């Protein structure tokens, strides 16, 4: 199973959100985008595609799933009755590794997969 093993704080800074299980550090100290010129980047207006991509990446990194796993969850949610967005979150919350994290047995999302 492949998973992201790179710097977690850089992901949080790129997304602009403090993801709860991604790490123990918060974005309070360095809240600018990552990179050499991150502090000087002007907040340009994102396109609709850019906003949707950002939200998808937040979901992926928050729940620790790959692109293929997320696609499978979305297809399952489309088949079920009800609001698709709510079903996606419901299916992701039902995963065993997420239940281990929510129950408090693992402090971070990386450790929840090992439990």
Curated annotation (Swiss-Prot):
Concerning Pfam families, the annotation shows: Ribosomal_S4 (PF00163)
Top-rank taxon: Bacteria
Q: Which SUPFAM superfamilies does this entry report, sorted A to Z? A: Alpha-L RNA-binding motif
Question: Which cysteine pairs are covalently linked by disulfides here?
Answer: none
Name a GO molecular-function annotation: rRNA binding
| InterPro entries registered for this protein in UniProt | Ribosomal_uS4_N
Additional remarks: A C-terminally tuncated form of ribosomal protein uS4, this is probably not functional.
Q: Which family does it belong to?
A: Belongs to the universal ribosomal protein uS4 family.
Protein name stated in the entry: Ribosomal protein uS4-like
